[in-house]
Design a protein with these regions (language model features):
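A structural signal for small-residue-enriched, beta-sheet-centric alpha/beta enzyme cores
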Residues: 4, 8, 15, 165-172, ...
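Surface-exposed flexible segments
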Residues: 80-82, 222-226, 358-364
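Generic N-terminal targeting/processing segments that precede catalytic cores or assembly contacts
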Residues: 1-159, 163-165, 360
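Generic domain-boundary/flexible-linker signal
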Residues: 107, 157, 218, 263-265, ...
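Short, amphipathic C-terminal "tail helix"
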Residues: 342-370
Length: 370
């Protein structure tokens, strides 16, 4: 068998912005742009970036870097990270401003307070460090006004969860290591965590994680939830639950399609099809335990889709969805352990019709419910 090729890593928006800021500040101090420009990542690695643009005037320098996400399907891949840098007033330090396409935080609960540009703490520190190092080399004060912009960023942001997090006007400048690991989906999981933070800061006591648009629409209608209570967890139920364990919310609903909730019931915390399919022999055993007619057990064992199984069970008068929801509840409750949370599981079909439910119960009761 031919081995799969290694996937190419990329660079975060924070790393790209740091490189552009360093090049711009160097130009203000020396009159020349370093190209390529080398930066040090938080882990100590040095890497160089080629400049896409550069311009220098008496009062400002502008440099830009094209975001390369490697082989990761990142919406910001190919975006232009542009930094315009001016010398700040004496003693002002480094200040940050959102230019075109960079968002502004409007809700509490994130690492950056409302009113500030959506430039996360690690990228801010990376930029401050790069400026401080250059300032020390050239005996300069190190005061700088840093404006970051991403042309087209506001349109790109509609393909992210920024709007739901209360980040308006564009994208966030992100990254904790400076490196994008392909298909780690760290940005999505990061957004889930920040969604929980925003909900908690807003006093929301009931959040709902959904696997997709159909289940989100259905659970929102069922519980009349505000948008800030909705967590687009996708396949990452494990990442959501682990964060909720240490950042609890009184009530949690997990809502999803029958196939993904069946995988949760079978113990999977990553619901992506690449991580594993529905175990149909296991589903047949669950159907038998739930009291499904004997004549459909073998067809279930050899079914092609979970939807087909639920249709078979429904046609023979068995509420298989409730049994699957109950088992999914036990799996999810085990992750939450003894957090002060009541948990609910909802299964929906493709039309948004409820197919199974395990109602709210405190997760500390899970041992009694097994």
């Amino acid at each position: 068998m031919k081995p799969e090729p290694l996937l190419r890593r990329g660079w975060t928006t924070g790393a790209c912005a740091t490189a552009a800021a360093k090049a711009a500040y160097a130009a203000l101090l020396t009159g020349h742009f370093p190209d390529p420009v080398e930066i040090t990542l938080p882990g100590g690695q040095n890497t160089a970036f080629t400049l896409a643009e550069s311009a220098l005037s008496e009062t400002a320098a502008m440099a830009s870097v094209v975001k390369d996400a490697g082989d990761d399907p990142d919406v910001t891949h190919g975006a232009l990270l542009r930094v315009t840098l001016r010398i700040g007033p004496p003693g002002s330090g480094v200040s940050f401003h959102a230019g075109e396409g960079v968002g502004t935080v409007t809700r509490p609960g994130l690492a950056i307070p409302p009113g500030e540009p959506a430039i996360n703490p690690v990228p801010r520190q990376m930029i401050r460090t790069a400026i401080a190092e250059l300032a020390a080399q050239h005996c300069a004060p190190g005061d700088a006004i840093v404006e970051i912009s991403i042309p087209g960023g506001e349109a790109l942001a509609t393909r992210t969860l920024n709007g739901r997090l209360g980040i308006t006007g564009g994208l966030s400048i992100l990254g904790t290591t400076g490196i994008v690991i392909p298909f780690s989906c760290s940005a999505w999981i990061h957004s889930i965590h920040r969604g929980i933070d925003v909900a908690r800061a807003g006093g929301i006591t009931h959040v709902a994680g959904s696997t997709g648009n159909v289940s989100e629409t259905a659970v929102r209608a069922l519980h009349h939830l505000p948008e800030a209570a909705l967590l687009e967890m996708g396949d990452f139920v494990g990442g959501m639950l682990k964060y909720l364990k240490s950042h609890p919310v009184p009530r949690v609903t997990i809502a999803g399609g029958v196939a993904k909730m069946t995988k949760l019931a079978q113990g999977r915390l990553d619901l992506h099809s690449k991580r594993g399919e529905v175990d149909f022999p296991g589903l047949a055993a669950a159907a038998q335990t739930a009291g499904c007619a004997p004549e459909i057990i073998e067809p279930i064992r050899h079914a092609n889709t979970a939807a087909q199984v639920f249709e078979l069970a429904s046609a023979h008068g068995t509420a298989l969805g409730d049994a699957i929801a109950a088992q999914a509840w036990r799996v999810a409750a085990a992750v939450l352990e003894d957090s002060p949370t009541e948990l609910e599981i909802l299964l929906f079909d493709r039309t948004g019709t409820l197919q199974g439910r395990a109602g709210f119960a405190p997760v500390h009761m899970r041992k009694r419910l097994v």
